[in-house]
């Protein structure tokens, strides 16, 4: 019998999965239903068209969405832009164009027994069907769609609303969405960006677009650490099995020491520490799964933020912009915690405690931007779909609140600890089991493996 596979979300993960399923659909034929709530297939939040050209954080030569053609995106970009090379950091909207073309191309070349159905709408729940197909996707504005398989291809969840911002909802000087920035700021204004990661860098880039109207920028996070810069290096230069690292998964301290030794050895040989990070990244899922839970918790408390700044890096031109702003006094990067924010007419007064200090400091700004990053704790999610999934017991959070518990190929683990045969997850919340699952190459590989599994499995 012809099968129906429903993919919820048409950002990177959902689009690449749909393209792979079109190329390798189950033998009995399949309807692949791709559902997107934001109005544009292939873009999601990350690659949406915006009035500011946000850059990709990875060079063009390392962003192919098809492992069979490693330079596919580079060739796509070179056909559309002048003088593009593999080391360039290109606009994210162009990558969204590329993903849309991948989907259209896969649809054109699909075998006769595979069909893509595009649906625009919001999925509010996944239902256990009473008969016939095992699941159904419930939508806000139309009848449920019955499915043999449902794949939750959901991207990064939005940032949580911090406790100090609870009374700032709707205030003109507060932005919960870091890309929803006012265009009326001038050099006389001041802005506090809460968070020092990649989202902060995007906000700094957008707020400093006009050289004569750059507001005074402050950024604040608990440790005051910012991402390291990207550079050109040979990602595949290091070879080996990683046995020395895998031998120390019983102890985080020993594992960290071995990682540092590896980075020093690379640099002694004239290499770049980024090569060591790339090597460790490839081993990260195995290392993470073998660490005892007590060591995982220690990593979360003390080391995850350090891993992130080395692992998730900035385009060199964006880092240069940040350094220029710091030297000019237009940007101040701070470490500490916000204690309270009070509205004073059109401004906000921020009381915060510097890291390592005993006394609170005060800062009055014209705008506060929440850039603290995604909220992976699904137990606290207020998204209607996750609330429904949680209440139905179809999904469960991992012990560290890093994302979703999953089995092989991303099969969702339910509240009873059983891996589903019909419900899968593909996206950054795989980090619970893999530590990292946000880069395009990682999600591409997950998508290809899942598509191959679904094509071979007896649905």
Regions found by a protein language model. Give the residues of each.
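Redox-cofactor-proximal catalytic regions of oxidoreductases
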Residues: 36-81
């Amino acid at each position: 019998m012809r099968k129906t596979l429903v993919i919820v979300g048409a950002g990177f993960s959902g689009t690449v999965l749909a393209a792979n399923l079109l190329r390798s659909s189950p033998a009995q034929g399949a309807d692949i239903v791709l559902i997107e709530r934001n109005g544009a297939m292939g873009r999601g939040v990350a690659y949406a068209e915006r009035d500011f050209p946000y850059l990709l954080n990875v060079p063009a030569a390392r962003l192919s969405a098809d492992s069979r053609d490693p330079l596919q995106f580079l060739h796509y970009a070179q056909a559309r832009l002048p003088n593009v090379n593999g080391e360039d950091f290109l606009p994210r909207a162009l990558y969204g164009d590329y993903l849309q073309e991948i989907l259209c191309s896969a649809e054109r070349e699909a075998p006769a027994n595979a069909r893509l159905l595009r649906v625009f709408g919001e999925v509010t729940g996944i239902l256990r069907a009473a008969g016939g197909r095992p699941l159904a996707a419930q939508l806000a504005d139309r009848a449920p769609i019955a499915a043999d398989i449902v794949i939750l291809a959901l991207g990064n969840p939005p940032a949580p609303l911090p406790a100090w911002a609870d009374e700032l909802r709707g205030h003109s000087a507060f932005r919960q969405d870091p890309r929803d920035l006012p265009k009326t700021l001038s050099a006389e204004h001041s802005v506090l960006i809460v968070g020092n990661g990649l989202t902060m860098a995007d906000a700094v880039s957008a707020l400093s677009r006009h050289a004569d109207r750059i507001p005074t920028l402050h950024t604040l996070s608990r440790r005051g650490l910012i991402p390291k810069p990207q550079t050109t290096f040979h990602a595949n230069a290091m070879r080996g099995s990683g046995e020395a690292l895998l031998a120390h998964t019983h102890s985080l301290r020993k594992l960290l020491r071995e990682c540092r030794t590896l980075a020093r050895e690379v640099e002694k040989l004239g290499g770049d520490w980024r090569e060591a990070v790339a090597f460790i990244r490839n081993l990260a899922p195995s290392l993470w799964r073998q660490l005892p839970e007590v060591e995982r918790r220690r990593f979360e408390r003390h080391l995850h933020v350090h891993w992130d700044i080395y692992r998730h890096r900035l385009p060199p031109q964006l880092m240069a912009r940040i350094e220029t702003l710091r030297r000019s006094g237009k940007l101040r990067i701070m470490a500490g915690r916000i204690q309270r924010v009070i509205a004073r007419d059109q401004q906000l007064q921020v009381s915060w405690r510097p890291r390592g200090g005993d006394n609170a400091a005060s800062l009055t700004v014209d705008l506060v931007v929440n850039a603290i990053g995604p909220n992976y704790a699904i137990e606290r999610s207020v998204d209607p779909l996750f609330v429904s999934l949680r209440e139905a017991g179809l999904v469960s959070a991992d012990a560290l609140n890093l994302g979703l518990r999953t089995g092989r190929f991303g099969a969702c683990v339910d509240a009873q600890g059983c891996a589903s045969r019909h419900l899968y997850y593909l996206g950054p919340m795989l980090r619970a089991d893999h530590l990292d699952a946000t880069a395009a190459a990682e999600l591409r590989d997950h998508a290809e493996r899942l598509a191959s599994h679904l094509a071979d499995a007896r649905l």
